[in-house]
Amino acid sequence: MNALSPALDLSPALVVLPGPKAGAADGAGSRLLSSREAERLAARGPVVVAHAALTARRLGLQAPPRSRDIFDALELYAFVRPAQFCAPSAAGLAVALGLAEPKGPAAQAQALADVCRMLLGELAETPWPSREEALALAETLSRAGWAWAGAVVTALRSKAVKEGHRGSGLDVWTRVSEWEDQAPPGESGSTPVEPEAARARLAELLVRRGLDEARPAQAEFAAEVAFAFQPREREGEPRMMLAEAGTGVGKTLGYLAPASLWAEANGPAVWVSTYTRALQRQIDRESAALFPDPAVRARKAVVRKGRENYLCLLNFQEAVQAAQLGNGDLIGLALAARWARASRDGDMTGGDFPGWLPTLFAVGPAAQASAANLVDRRGECVHAACPHYRACFIEKTIRASRRADLVIANHALVLTQAAFDGARAARGLKGDIESTALKRIVFDEGHHLFDAADSAFSAALSGAEAAELRRWVRGPEGRGRRGRGLEARLLDLVADREDARKALGEALHAAAALPGEGWSGRIAPPSGEASPIGPVEQFLTAVLEQLRARTSERGGGPADLGQECSARPALELVRATAGKAARALAAVEAPLLALARRLEDLLDDEADALGGAERARIEGALRGLDRRARMLLPAWRAMLQAIEEDAEDDPDFVDWFESNSMFGRVVDAACRRHWVDPTEPLRAAVLSPAHGVLVTSATLADPTLSDPFALAEMRTGAARLPDRPKTLRLASPFDYGKNARAFVVTDVRRDDARQVAAAMRELFLAAGGGGLGLFTAIRRLRAVHDLIARPLADKGLALYAQHVDPLEPGALVDIFRAEADSCLLGTDAVRDGVDVPGRALRLLVFDRVPWPRPDLLHKARRERFGGKGYDDSVARARIGQAFGRLIRRADDRGVFVMLDAAAPTRLFSGLPEGIELRRMGLVEAIEATAEFLGAKATE
């Protein structure tokens, strides 16, 4: 019996794997169950599971609400080990607790029961951060009806505790550390980094990592990229370098070596930017070689994301207050409070927050303790007026990044921050106080820089965006909504300034013309009878009219991608409503600009009287006003005015209309404008102001070109600089001829879902699992999943799928990594985010060539950048990037399969040296896969 929780011994552990295949474990041992037996066990309760919603889905049931009879072990883990990683499955829990990976549902059920006992024992011995604090929250959870509360309270009371009032434990904002002001760091210096010094620093880092010496290619990389850390000689001409380093070269430590030397000699900071969260986390881990002491590392290497990624303590407090009144998920919030107390930086999206936590039970989206509800997504921060300002995770991260040696950021943040700084500089203002100057930048995953720039420097007027602007100005208008409008944020600051109050009132009045509550149902109702309110909704309704008149659904149906058409020539109705919408936006823009000027005057007129808190509030408000009144609204009006005037197309831009669909019906419409070549604003905002820029990736060069870096220069903006960048190309040290195979299957019809599914099923079985299937369309992914999930389960292989399983891609990849014989289906997001070394990923199958989608934007770029050759380059790069996911270590083996007989051989020229592409029938490919990977398993 378990002294900490006798009930646990009486509650069977249930695991349901894809297929479904089920197993249970209790005092009598572990056993396999039929689906019907598993359903009865789940319905009867009490039962221990790992991810209740996913378990129910696999049994064909609805996700259950929380119940005292459903013990989700993942919630117990989140309480006992807050802010610690765990893949959200029974096997993931076992691995997290140091157990061997259990194979099959019965073994996983037994492991699940063992894990729960281990966690309760751990809690009894060493509760974090203190027994009293954990007990306060546990008692609150008990009153809220948490299934685990009895066992948790028993474990915590197994040793003496102080009696008396402990509070709810939910007020985490009173217990997180506060930041302190420090003197400004000053301007960065220009001391160069010598190549030999970079080599020496790399050697030091490798010793700290327990390695004897640098690989020759890694040492060469570190020495060569020191070029990007030399002083620039002329304004607008950065030291720019493009460096391709194949998988296994060790480029991360290779560039951290000179970057750390530059930061030590010159002051803050080198910005290291990535495209994916996975690499951001990896670089953060690698920085431990630079700063082995965790306390020093916390100061010197700071992970920085946009404000919308971090827990807002004021939002959390308001959510707790609402939940205590019955309007929210109090149990989820209590577990989030445990996490917030332990979190390194409060990052809820890709940090140490368990993103699977809000998805375990059937909780309405608006009530979940999720990032969507708890971060500052709407720009409503009141800055110094917030009672939690000194404890704010966002402010702590911002201040830490100002003094750090390394700021580990992402492309989106770096580009939008640079664009904002550029806009302020054009008005003679200093850059944003929320960042240090972007003087030295390393863009890792540089092959994504073009796409990141395309997103950062584009404009989109949609119903959702316009409604968000209305909320930002006017605040929440529906019942039960949380949020703060301009008046709530600023009225007390401008109370004695009549001109500012007048501008504020005019902005509130004008914003009423923007889409309000229920706008989506008015512009695109199921009945088809639109009833728009206001000029912006009328314009969007007209946009939908033009879309219906000129297009058919793209992507095979409205439930997939919606529709798109060129904005010009516009329907007369579109032109007329565009003009009215432009004037409505101008009416919002003018008072916002006036308010910004009044706030700037306030900073100037009362410079000697304003306290630091008041100044911070005003500067924060000005940042929000600048982004909307000086950047967003002018961009929207420019699009609308061009449509109203039916002006000729600007050769530098592509304007188009599109609709977005969900569950088979249109839910939004948008007018979009993108640069044909977004590297022009990239150059102006990011490259030219910088002093040194390193762009690196394992797949930058195109070996089919006479100049392998010509395309990379174009797609990174380097071609727009006065001087050509320095280039470097280092091959992977891996023996791909020995460790990898690449096949094109010639007898599978790619348009026949049954044939594709059969091929993928047999290849996964031949590999014994560890297969990743990549699709270019969600519809085909779902069709294949439905056809192969059960047959794979019958053979003991679990199949997970993006857009099918109710988990975000990162969580699916975590499970895939933890369960070495599982398989995963995904699209681009999975391809770019997969970092799975070892046998867990040993087979990669493409359903077809990943050509770029032939939309209007791609058509314009195709014409600009080389026609068919441009298509080839994009597809070749995607294939190369996917192949790079397959072999991550020198001892990995993997098979790459393309199920598209029409795939041109030229698209595979970017694969590493030593790879021989073979074309063969499916049967031969299955046999070759089994032989190659089977040989590895028996070595």
Regions inferred by a protein language model and the residue ranges of each:
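A substrate-engagement module of RecA-like helicase motors
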Residues: 192-204, 268-269, 274-405, 412, ...
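Walker A/P-loop
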Residues: 234-258
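Conserved RecA-like P-loop NTPase helicase motor core
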Residues: 733-751, 804-904
